[in-house]
């Protein structure tokens, strides 16, 4: 029996194996839970490599390619797929959606391969090895999976333009100069402008019909031609107020710095003056006390001299 006809499926490894001995033992894990695949010899190799669910996954891959093509304006997707060249969408291989396990690759027809696309995108989303992909894709999680893969949390371009900015767009009159230049047609509806009709002019000088550009700006804050974003009307005032607050803050800080620099000197000068005053007062008080003491001593001496001069005797009580 050839190796092709002896192809078995190991339920433990969850893959097809070729038994090299008579014993029904997997050559990879050594387990005995193997089952012979009942297929014809002419289609054995091709059917082992290509699972029947590949057709379903290829259909799902085609659906995803169409959804990605519709969202080609998305910068992140464009940057991610741009390196693959102009054939990036057509060269996408069939997708294998799985979750919770390590990625793996399976060979498909025409030398293609199945690539892992989502690894546990969300709880309950994905298929594990050995499960039937058809049971999952037609199950209750299909809408949730498609919504996550088609929208996800990718960047969707500029946010909507503010209503004040839309109302502030100038309205101009179409002249012969416009009709003779590249601005003769509206970039949205491709209709030619009529002479002396009104049009909305963007800050980038591209002009549009009002009915064409306003619905676009309600969803995208950018010019459809050059992608230049529409500035917010309050940005200038907010910038000016921020500059004023910054200027006032610097002035207040400068004033505080000046006062903080001057204050120690004023404090030192004031302290020195007060110290000098206290010293002078102390010296004056001490000097006054000294003069008062001198005057008292002089008065005592003067009184003592007067007493001695009035007595006039040598100390005897009687004169002879």
Swiss-Prot record:
It is an enzyme of class 2 (transferase). It comes from the Eukaryota. Residues 229-320 are annotated as: Disordered. Disruption phenotype: Reduced sensitivity to osmotic stress, dehydration and abscisic acid (ABA) during early seedling development. Increased proline accumulation and higher expression of stress-related genes (e.g. RAB18, RD29A, RD29B, AOX1A, ERD15, ERD1, COR15A, P5CS1 and P5CR) under drought stress. Lower production of malondialdehyde (MDA) upon drought stress. Slightly enhanced pollen tube growth. Impaired bZIP11 accumulation after rehydration following drought. Gene3D superfamilies: Zinc/RING finger domain, C3HC4 (zinc finger). SMART domains: RING. A zinc finger (RING-type) spans 186-227. Expressed in seedlings and in flowers. This is E3 ubiquitin-protein ligase RZF1. The modification N-acetylserine is found at residue 2. E3 ubiquitin-protein ligase that promotes osmotic stress and abscisic acid (ABA) responses. Negatively regulates drought-mediated control of early seedling development, probably by influencing proline content, water loss, membrane ion leakage and the expression of dehydration stress-related genes (e.g. RAB18, RD29A, RD29B, AOX1A, ERD15, ERD1, COR15A, P5CS1 and P5CR). Modulates bZIP11 accumulation during rehydration following drought. Induction: Repressed by drought and osmotic (e.g. 400 mM mannitol) stresses. The keyword Zinc-finger applies. GO terms for molecular function: ubiquitin protein ligase activity; ubiquitin-protein transferase activity; zinc ion binding. Residues 232-249, 295-308 have a biased composition (Low complexity). It catalyses: S-ubiquitinyl-[E2 ubiquitin-conjugating enzyme]-L-cysteine + [acceptor protein]-L-lysine = [E2 ubiquitin-conjugating enzyme]-L-cysteine + N(6)-ubiquitinyl-[acceptor protein]-L-lysine. Its EC number is 2.3.2.27. GO terms for biological process: abscisic acid-activated signaling pathway; negative regulation of proline biosynthetic process; regulation of response to osmotic stress; response to osmotic stress; response to water deprivation. SUPFAM superfamilies: RING/U-box. Keywords: Abscisic acid signaling pathway, Acetylation, Metal-binding, Stress response, Transferase, Ubl conjugation pathway, Zinc, Zinc-finger.
């Amino acid at each position: 029996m050839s190796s092709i006809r002896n192809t078995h499926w190991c339920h433990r490894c969850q893959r097809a194996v070729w038994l090299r001995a008579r014993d029904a033992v997997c050559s990879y894990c050594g387990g005995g839970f193997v089952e012979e695949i009942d297929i014809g010899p002419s289609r054995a190799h091709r059917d082992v490599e290509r699972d029947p669910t590949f057709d379903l996954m290829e259909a799902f891959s085609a659906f995803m390619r169409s959804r990605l093509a519709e969202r080609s304006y998305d910068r992140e997707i464009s940057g991610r797929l741009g390196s693959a060249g102009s054939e990036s969408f057509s060269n996408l291989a069939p997708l294998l959606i799985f979750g919770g396990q390590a990625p793996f690759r399976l060979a498909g027809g025409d030398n293609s391969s199945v690539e892992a696309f989502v690894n546990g995108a969300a709880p309950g989303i994905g298929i594990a090895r050995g499960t039937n992909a058809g049971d999952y894709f037609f199950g209750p999680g299909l809408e949730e999976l498609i919504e996550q893969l088609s929208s996800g949390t990718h960047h969707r371009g500029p946010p909507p333009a503010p209503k004040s900015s839309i109302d502030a767009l100038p309205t101009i009159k179409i002249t012969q100069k416009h009709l003779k230049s590249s601005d003769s047609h509206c970039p949205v509806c491709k209709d030619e402008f009529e002479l002396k009709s009104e049009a909305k002019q963007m800050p980038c000088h591209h002009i549009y019909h009002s009915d064409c550009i306003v619905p676009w700006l309600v969803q995208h804050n950018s010019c459809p031609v050059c992608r230049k974003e529409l500035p917010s009307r309050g940005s200038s005032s907010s910038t000016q107020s921020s500059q004023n607050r910054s200027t006032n803050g610097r002035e207040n800080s400068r004033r505080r710095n000046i006062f903080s620099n001057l204050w120690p000197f004023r404090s030192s000068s004031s302290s020195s003056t007060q110290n000098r005053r206290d010293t002078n007062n102390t010296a004056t008080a001490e000097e006054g006390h000294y003069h008062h003491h001198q005057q008292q001593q002089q008065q005592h001496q003067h009184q003592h001299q007067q007493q001695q001069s009035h007595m006039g005797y040598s100390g005897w009580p009687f004169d002879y």
